[in-house]
Swiss-Prot record:
Annotated organism of origin: Mus musculus (Mouse)
Keyword line: Coiled coil, Phosphoprotein
Protein name (database record): Coiled-coil domain-containing protein 54
Gene3D superfamilies: 1.10.287.1490
Coiled-coil annotated residue ranges, if any: 86-149
PANTHER family with a match to the protein in the record: COILED-COIL DOMAIN-CONTAINING PROTEIN 54
Amino acid sequence: MYRFHTKRVRAAAGQVWTANLHKIRRSLKNVYQKCTTHHSYSTSYPTRASYGCDGDTLSLNEDMNLPAMLQDIKTGQTELLNQMTNIVSSISNIQEKINHYQNQMEALEARINISEDRQTATTKDMLSMKEDINTLKKKVTELESQNSYSSIHCLEVLEGQRGKEFVQLLHKLLQTETPKGTATSPDTVISSAEPERVSSYPEPTGELKKKTTSPQNITLKKNNSLQNASVGCKKVRSNIYIYPDFSTWIKLTFVHGGNWRFFLSATKLEEFIQWLLSRSTILPEEPQIIPQRDYAFTGAIGRLATICLSLFHYVYCLFGSSKEEITRL
């Protein structure tokens, strides 16, 4: 825009300058022609009288033409000065407009830079959000795979022949290790046990009744005690509860003279069973007889331990996982 205005101003100044210069040249040309004509006339008629008369007329014409020529030059200069002042004022206006437009362009550039910075920040935020979403998706898929794997692994362990063998081995190991810390006299155990514990045991068969009533049970050998313990363990049942959670904890309850509860993860069930299998199963040659009061004391401790474990398990299930029982064996 300002370039167009400068071009127009330059064109107008050039036109004014050429017009004034043309006028000056024309006036000078007229004077020169008059002088040349007068000189030629004086040479063609060389008389004194005419020369004097012509000299007077020439001097008068020159006196008349010089002020007019000077006046024309002066007017041309004034016009040129006015036009130059107009040009300068228009140029100053154009410069002001240029400055205004430049300020507007700078403001627009600043806004564009701010918008670009915001756009880059938003793109970075979007990329970080996408990365977070991808990581969350990966974690969710990992948790789902772990949950499915743990449940499948638990079911594989608990179901089928392998699970049954593990449960039977656990029963045998617990039955063989309990005479070290519990009473072995069937009469004292049954008489001192509470109704709940008695109800948890199945009723013994005829062979077991004979073995329990006979006084020779106190001096049994290893083979007879192991056989009786395995037979008794086969009739004792265990309750296994699986609680649905991401970690899939398992509660194992083994009933043998009291409630023993274990809380372990489904993925570590096999490790726990291997640890139990790796333990030594050495039995004492003669079972120990524990009095009635000692067994009552140990029974109270066992009840207190089971109450504490049950409270802990209830709080854990209340705040950490669901209370539904998926599988019960």
